[in-house]
Amino acid sequence: MKKYLKDYEYKILYKRIIFTCWILLIYIFGTHIPAITTVRTYTAISNFYKMTAANVGGDYQALNVFSLGLGPWLTAMIFMTLFYYRDSDRMMKQTRREKSTKERIFTLILALIQAYFVVFTLLSHVKIDHSEKWLIILVLVTGAMILVWLSDLNMRFGIAGPMPIVMISIIRSIMRQNVALSELGPTLLISAALVLIIILLVLIFIEITEYRLPYLDVMDVSSRREHTYLAWKLNPGGSIAIMISFAAFFVLNSAVNLIVQFFNSKNNGVLNFLDFSTPIGITIFLILQLVLSYGISRLILDPKRKAKDFKKNGDFFPGVEPGKPTYHYLIHKARRISWIGAFIVTIIIGIPLYATLLIPQFSKEIYLSV
C-alpha cells in the first residue's frame, strides 16, 4: 500500500511537471508573436524598465503578445488583498468566483493603462495611425489576460503558479544583456564583488533572523518546561514586495503619463521625473517600496488572526491580559518588525540605485545586479 501511494504521488508530480512545461511552451511561443510588424521599435523606456518588466514576465525589448507580463495581475492581487486587510472577515466570506472576478476587473483596468503608456512610448517615433495603436493596445491587453489565465491554470494543475513564467522571462532578459566585465577595471570589480557579498550576507541574516515572542501555552501539561514562543521573520514578504514594487511603480508611471497626455495633448513625450535616471524617480520608487514592503509584511504576519487564535486556545503573553490588550500588543510588535524589515530592504535596494546616478556608464551592470 505504501509503495502504491508513493508511485501515485510520483505520477501526480510527473503530470504536473508536464503541464507546466506545456504552459512554458505556450508562453515562449507567444513571446515570438510580434504585436507590430516592424524590424525594431524605437524605445524611450530605460534599460531598468526592461529588466524589471522581465521580473514579472514582461518584455519591452520588442512588442509581442505577452509584453505586459503578469505585472497588472500581481499589482491588482496585492492591492485587493491590502484593501480588504482591515476587513478580513468580509474577504473570507467571499467565494472564489467573487474574488477572481474583482481581481480580473482590476487587472483589466491596470493592463489597459499600462498598455496605453507602453504603446505610445515605444511607438512614439513610428508613423502609424491611432486606430492601429489602439488595436495593438487591444492585443497587449488580451495577451496579458491570457497570461493570467495560464498562470491560474498552472497554479491549479502545474507547479509553482506564475513563478516558472517569471523565471523564463528573467533568464531571457539576462541573456540579452551585453555586460562587458573587462571594461569595468579590477578595482571596480573587486569593490562591486565586496559590496555584493556584504549585501548577500545581510540578506541571509534577514532571512534567518526571527523575532520571538514568548507566551504561555495553557494546554501544555507535560513536565518538560520548554519555552513556547511566536516566531516572526524580520522580512516575511521576501522578494514578493520587491517584485510588486517594480510592477506598481511602472503602473504609477503609466497612469501619470496617461493623465498628462490626456490634459495636454501637445505633450507626447515621457515624463522624466518618474524615471530611474533622476533622484526624484528613485526616491519615489523607494518610498513606494518602503510602504508596500511594510503593508505586505503586516498582511503576512496578520496580528488580528493571531490574537483570535490566542483567545480561542486560551494562550497568553506574560504580563499581557487576554483579549484586546493581546491584540494591541501583537499590533505593536508587528508594526515594529514590519518597519524594521522594510527599512533594511529599502536601504539595500536604494544604495545601488543611487549609485547609478554617480556612475551612469555602468547603470546596466548595476541594474542587472539588482
UniProtKB/Swiss-Prot annotation:
Belongs to the SecY/SEC61-alpha family. SecY2 subfamily. InterPro entries: SecY/SEC61-alpha, SecY2, SecY_dom_sf. It is found in: Cell membrane. The chain crosses the membrane at residues 17-37, 65-85, 105-125, 134-154, 155-175, 188-208, 240-260, 276-296, 339-359. This is Accessory Sec system protein translocase subunit SecY2. GO terms for cellular component: plasma membrane. Keywords: Cell membrane, Membrane, Protein transport, Translocation, Transmembrane, Transmembrane helix, Transport. The gene is secY2. Part of the accessory SecA2/SecY2 system specifically required for export of possible cell wall proteins. The central subunit of a protein translocation channel. It comes from Staphylococcus carnosus (strain TM300).
